């Protein structure tokens, strides 16, 4: 959670440093969209290795769900 907040603060500072006159610029819009997506209540949280899961989408990156008793695991093959 602290990492997400740090990223949001950095993005906000970067958007402020570009100046208000450039607010229609693509980078500024991207930073705003990312900030909104990260802070929205719909932002999903993924779990790392061993994290509790019931579906592959609950696991971060290339991790797959091995079931509630196993948790998120590294997989060489794509998740099902």
Curated annotation (Swiss-Prot):
Residues 1-19 form the signal peptide. GO terms for cellular component: extracellular region. Keywords: Disulfide bond, Secreted, Signal, Toxin. GO terms for molecular function: ion channel inhibitor activity; toxin activity. Disulfide bonds join 46-60, 53-65, 59-72, 64-79. Expressed by the venom duct. Transmembrane segments: none annotated. InterPro entries: Conotoxin. The keyword Disulfide bond applies. Residues 20-42 form a propeptide. It is found in: Secreted. The cysteine framework is XI (C-C-CC-CC-C-C). Belongs to the conotoxin I3 superfamily. This is Conotoxin Ca11.3.
């Amino acid at each position: 959670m602290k990492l997400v907040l740090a990223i949001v603060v950095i993005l906000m500072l970067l958007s402020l440093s570009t100046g208000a006159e450039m607010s229609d610029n693509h980078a500024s819009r991207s930073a705003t969209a990312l900030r909104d997506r990260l802070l929205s209540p719909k932002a999903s949280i993924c779990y790392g290795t061993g994290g509790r899961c019931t579906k592959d989408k609950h696991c971060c990156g290339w991790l797959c769900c091995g079931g509630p008793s196993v948790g998120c695991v590294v997989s060489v093959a794509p998740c099902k």
